[in-house]
Amino acid sequence: MGSVPRVLEGERYDQFALESFVKSYWEENSIYRKVKEKSSRAPRKFYFLDGPPYASAKSIHIGTAWNKVVKDVVLRFYRMTGYNVWDKPGYDTHGLPIEVKIEQSLGVRVKREIEEKVGVENFIAACKRFVDENMEAMTRQFKEIGVFMDWENPYVTYRDEYIESGWWLVKKAWEKGLLYKGYRVLHWCPRCETTLADYEVSEYRELEDPSIYVKFPVEGREGEYLLVWTTTPWTLPANAFVMAHPDMEYVKVRVGRDTLILAKARLDHVMREAGVSEYEVLEVLKGSQLEGLRYRHPLEDVVDAQRELSKWHKVVMAPEAVTPHEGSGLVHSAPGHGTIDYEIAQRIGAPVVSLVDERGFMTEAAGKYSGLYFRGEANKAIVEDLRARGALFHAATIVHRYPVCWRCKTPLLLRATTQWFVAVTRLKNQLMREAEKVEWQPGWAKTRFMNMLRELRDWVISRQRYWGIPLPVWRCSSCGYEHVVGSVEELESMGGRRPENLHRPWVDRVELKCPRCGGSMKRVPDVLDVWFDSGIAFYASLGYPRDRETWERLKPVDFIVEGHDQIRGWFFSLLRSGVIGFGETPYRRVLVHGFALDEQGREMHKSLGNYVDFEELIAKVPRDVVRFWVLQNTVWEDLRFSWKGLDLMRRDFNVIWNVYAFASIYMGLDRFDPRRTSLSSVEDSLEVEDRWILSRLASLKRRYLTAMEDLRIHDAARALRSFIIEDVSHWYLRIIRRRVWEEVDTPSKRAAYATLYKVLWEWLLMAAPLIPYTAEYLYIKVFREAEERPEESIHMLDMPEPEDHLIDSTLEEDMEKARMVLEAILSARNEAGLKLRRPVRRVIIAASNPGVEGSLRRLEGLIRLMANAKEIEFAPASALEATRIYRVEPDYGRLGPKYKRDMPKVLRLIEEKGGEIGRVLAEKGVYEGEYEGLPVKLTLEDVSLKAEYPEWLKVRDTPLGLVAVDTRLTKEEVLEGLARDIVRRIQAMRKEAGYSVEDYVEVWIQGGEDVVEAVNALKEYIKRETRALKLEVGEPPSGVEVLREWELDGEKVVIALKRAAASG
């Protein structure tokens, strides 16, 4: 049978060394593979889908580490609760962020240089090399933080088989009539020369732009103008019409010689902003009265496009575009550069003209402004021309939030462009039905997700770039027919040759035979939206459609977790793909986590100097410490990084180590065998503290299992920490030390060992998913032998079963009250300068109600023991009140006018009978009496009343009532305290000398009368507590091994030790 080994005795705790040992152990013994093999035999499946981190850097962000730790905890928990866990990690490898990095490394300034100077083939190869290097570094870091996933077989979005899976979904959308090519206004990055979907427009900067009011002349009305406001002068050359609100009131205002038309609600603001103090309102009219009013464009003679657009120059009603809270109430509309403008133009049949090219420069149709960059050059030239023509009513600047490219940070523009779309708006009802089936944690994430679906727009899936899944659309150069290819086999069946790589430029060289006219078909040059890549991961990572069996066996995904930004990102992409391809949601449960920020709540960026490098972090802080610290944070709230917080958590690990070292050393010393001494065998010997900690353990198991199943990982982490630190270390171990230190084997000691063993073993099993290195080390070094387990890893074991029958809520509540009382006692002791080693005569408890008193009486013996008190006395509050000393200070300002010449008598009365007067005032609020023939009546307004307890009584007012400590010491109590102090010094010297806990010693003590008296009176107690075979008072002989001079209560004491001959 296996007794508990004493392996932790004398071992210097070093968490870094511990984790290094475990890491090597895992690698040398292929522990992950064995854990996975064991999990694969479980009957229930758990399909986890890894939201693939973006492989754009070699060092992972703290937030990415937190993300992977959360995933790892969930996977480890489900393995240990009987699930066959699918744990394939993934990497998101395509897209512009990577292209931008490669452009920078190659010195590429503009997009066309990729083809002209670098070559697409070389560019793609550089992207792949960059991604491969980053994946290798990231994988190493994920392993460092203890993440058990199938790192030998990750899914990688750039691989050909993954690309084919993407083509399958595009084909599916085409077959369902959902794929179409359309001309729409979309956000565009002029540096990257590609479009962005709405959900990609998530980054903004505070930028300065012009803020101008422009006069548009009304046709046929000399001197009358529509006053429009814009912050984008560069869109004015593409103006098609002006928008007004039909229900708003407008005014015609005389300003100098001009008559201006603008919204009544904006009049005062506009005039104040323009510095105009004199103006006259000529007429008030409804916006609907302006409908159809024609105007002339102030720049129509210098903009070629205006020749066609001038036919549409009139006021149209657009309540959705006009607000009384900004501008002039008249909005200039350029349908080629605004989404609402575009929709209104479609409604009224107006042309949609975009006068900005792919690189952000004005086109030839912009006339005079052709070749100017839209921001800066074009804005400046247009404002100057408007001023020169007298069309500029007022010009200023505005600082506002402006969208920038999430990849290169260039300011975006809206422009009309031809793109490929998936008509997900036609699936809106189905998407919302499927989304309702998903379980979200927390609940607000679902609300946000559903609100986003209500604002659904068609999915623009095409991008004008290189490093991405090529859009599988081939167009016939003869008849214009377009065909979507869903696989390489289909490519070959249409006369194409399988390219060596499915990326550009290889796939661009593949020509197909047109099934309609026999002509030659070439692929359209676009690639797919990078969100398409990760959005198909639920089936593409399994090899579908080539491998249909795995998806059919595993579907749906049981669990996904990512940051709350992915509500409109990855979670959305997955749902769209699931409904498009399979008609149903691909996932069942979603957990959302927060962002990792710095201590001030700012995002971490190298440019801000607040970025914490992962390698730096794990060089300074052990991995399990990092894990346990981040896991304490509420999962869906933002995490504020803190070196101090990590340092405090590191101290907790010292406590955890000491708890297990204590158990290992003393159980090993007494050769405790948990297989022989089961809890049931010592049930009759369990003390109240044993039953309490077992109840707390059972409560912990229930709370832990519920929290983990509900994905409230932070609750599980906090419960584990609180239990081992507060319940076990700070309370239970303090109580049972006296039982463990007994020299003889007693039923009480065996009961304490059996209880502590169960507590520490089951806590370790629950903690294993969260602190895998520490749990593995303690399992290998202590519990595997004690448990006689064949499993090589704790992560191959099962979670402990719930034991709700052990929960004693009454006892737990009683003990909580006892702990509160003890805190009050310790506080009172501290005030009196009485260390816990010094016994006190009595503790008086005046409970706030009979229920509290009942709880404390049930644990009276334990309170007396822990408080080191001779007696616990329960008394009413009035008993303590009776000990109070009242001091009365006269208020001369009140009493002087009241008693005048008799004031000296009143003062003598207060001096002589102040205590009595104070007590009466405290009880009744008024004192009445006679002194030297003078009737005296005093109230609380006449005096200042102070009530104090006597110096020897230290009182604490708690929610449970009053707790008082009688600090008067008898001679016996002083000697007991001295004896305890001597024991503590001897134990410190034993440790300093490196003695084993089982070594016996010989002790010599020199000191004053009290010390000598304490040693003689309590010699057997001191010998028992210090394992001393010999204890003598007097000068130590030569040959002692350690000698120290101490000061106890101001008295010098010399203590000398040497190992006794019986120590072996």
Swiss-Prot record:
Keywords assigned by UniProt, alphabetized: Aminoacyl-tRNA synthetase, ATP-binding, Cytoplasm, Ligase, Metal-binding, Nucleotide-binding, Protein biosynthesis, Zinc
InterPro entries: aa-tRNA-synth_Ia (IPR002300), Anticodon_Ile_ABEc (IPR033709), Ile-tRNA-ligase (IPR002301), Ile-tRNA-ligase_type2 (IPR023586), M/V/L/I-tRNA-synth_anticd-bd (IPR013155), Rossmann-like_a/b/a_fold (IPR014729), tRNAsynth_Ia_anticodon-bd (IPR009080), Val/Leu/Ile-tRNA-synth_edit (IPR009008)
Known cofactor(s): Zn(2+)
Recorded catalytic activity of this chain's protein: tRNA(Ile) + L-isoleucine + ATP = L-isoleucyl-tRNA(Ile) + AMP + diphosphate
Molecular function as annotated in GO: aminoacyl-tRNA deacylase activity; ATP binding; isoleucine-tRNA ligase activity; tRNA binding; zinc ion binding
Sequence motif: 'HIGH' region, positions: 53-64
An annotated GO BP: isoleucyl-tRNA aminoacylation
CDD domains: Anticodon_Ia_Ile_ABEc (cd07961), IleRS_core (cd00818)
Pfam families the UniProt entry points to: Anticodon_1, DUF5915, tRNA-synt_1
EC number: 6.1.1.5
Chain coiled-coil ranges: none
Subcellular location: Cytoplasm
Family to which the UniProt record says this protein belongs: Belongs to the class-I aminoacyl-tRNA synthetase family. IleS type 2 subfamily.
Free-text note regarding domains: IleRS has two distinct active sites: one for aminoacylation and one for editing. The misactivated valine is translocated from the active site to the editing site, which sterically excludes the correctly activated isoleucine. The single editing site contains two valyl binding pockets, one specific for each substrate (Val-AMP or Val-tRNA(Ile)).
Matching HAMAP family: Ile_tRNA_synth_type2 (MF_02003)
UniProt subunit comment: Monomer.
Protein name listed in UniProt: Isoleucine--tRNA ligase
